[in-house]
Amino acid sequence: MKKVVGLLVILFTAAFLPAVSANQKPAIAILDTAVDTTKVNVAYEVCIMEEKRCPNKQTFQEGPGSATMINPINGFEHGTHMSAIAQKVNPNMDIIFIRIVPATNSGTLGIYTDNTINEAMKWVIANKTKFNIVATSISFGSNRFTKKGHYCPVNQNLRNTIVTLQSMGVASLFAAGNRYDKTRVDYPACISEAVAVGAIGERGNIENYSNTGAELDFYALGTHDVVGRRIIGTSGATAALAAFWAKSYQGAYQPTYDFLKNNSSQLAVNVG
């Protein structure tokens, strides 16, 4: 069972953090709706869906244009917001954007599941070395599960993928959720090997909307002003922490996790 290990209070500008030592810039993979590349810089685009609704009318596409939309509205702008937050926190990294949400014929958000997430994360496994990916940021979650006993409905395939990524040095960060639940985070954030991220406010307060519980790993800033909008929620906190993870990467998963855990209080004090 996990427990909250750190309040990362507005730490994203902490100047004393060690820089990542590598010839190639670190990268994070953002799994989300779609991205507007006129507003954020994306190093590479991928589309992975359960339906044949990628721009090439297939379930898989990669390369320029794979994750973009002509008119990203009706919720599809969410991916642009997450990318902008990550880029603001850490401009010295690459963003690999993986679109996993299809558009219906009417232009609304289509169906995606934890199997979609798993397939996208398997792509990260195959391409981790090529792009130097050190973290994934996933905003999606669900709380449609029983309140009795152990509530986390683990998809073993997804869990195995998270464990494999962890062994390769890649953190799988999931949003805890914005459902005001003070005992449980959303699934898949509740998976023990996932890094569950809750939200704090600009004053360092735990946001009332943020889910919490024994499965939570970190709180991070959940309020960000990007692309002309104020974005609030655990999704933004997750994207921000993924970018900060890349900024403070210690060469492997566990040393980075421990660095953030052991220094979170100090970080909060030093930037206050």
Set out the residue ranges of the language-model regions:
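Extracellular S/T/G-rich loop segment that most often corresponds to the catalytic His/Ser-adjacent loop
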Residues: 26, 32, 186-251
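Structural recognition of the beta-strand scaffold that forms the well-ordered cores
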Residues: 27-31, 94-99, 132-139, 171-175, ...
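Active-site core segment of subtilase-fold serine proteases
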Residues: 23-97, 102-104, 112, 119, ...
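Bacterial N-terminal signal peptides
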Residues: 8-15
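Short, charged, surface-exposed loops that flank catalytic or proteolytic processing sites
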Residues: 249-261
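Sec/Tat signal peptide C-region and signal peptidase I cleavage site
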Residues: 17-21
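Substrate-binding/access-modulating region of protease and related hydrolase catalytic domains
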Residues: 101-191, 203-206, 228-240, 263-265, ...
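Positively charged n-region of N-terminal signal peptides that target proteins for export
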Residues: 1-4
